[in-house]
């Protein structure tokens, strides 16, 4: 493993938790998915929802941090055999993560500007409407 993959793993973990929270608020069980295999303790539906946002949230935050050298090799400790973000570097990562989640973009279906965190919840609610038959199909979120 390398530092970039370590950051991606961290970002994916945070994104999965954000998706799980959005699904719970929308009244859905995050453990019953349709793309990811349902397994005990695995939030399959959260992982399903996460797929729409993986590149636009997690990947983009990590690439930005690395490309702009806001996080460097010196920010990692590999004394345990794999690169771990040092305690002092966590605020840089979390600040970038929160900035991205709070960034407002146009939601194509709702036709209004929302923060990405709000879009996660909106997508969960759109999924509810689809499952209840109020929408003929589920439209995944895509940045245009």
Regions picked out by a protein language model, each given a short descriptive name:
Residues 1-144:
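N-terminal intrinsically disordered, cationic/polar leader segments
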């Amino acid at each position: 493993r390398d530092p970039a993959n370590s950051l991606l793993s961290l970002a994916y973990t945070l994104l999965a938790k954000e998706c799980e929270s959005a699904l719970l608020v929308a009244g859905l069980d995050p453990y019953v998915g349709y793309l990811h295999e349902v397994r005990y303790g695995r939030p399959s539906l959260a992982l399903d929802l996460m797929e729409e946002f993986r590149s636009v949230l997690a990947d983009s935050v990590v690439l930005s941090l690395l490309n702009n050298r806001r996080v460097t090799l010196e920010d990692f400790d590999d004394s345990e055999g794999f690169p771990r973000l040092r305690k002092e570097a966590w605020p840089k990562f979390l600040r970038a993560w929160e900035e991205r989640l709070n960034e407002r973009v146009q939601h194509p279906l709702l036709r209004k500007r929302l923060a990405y965190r709000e879009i996660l919840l909106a997508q969960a609610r759109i999924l509810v409407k689809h499952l209840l038959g109020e929408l003929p199909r589920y439209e995944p979120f895509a940045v245009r």
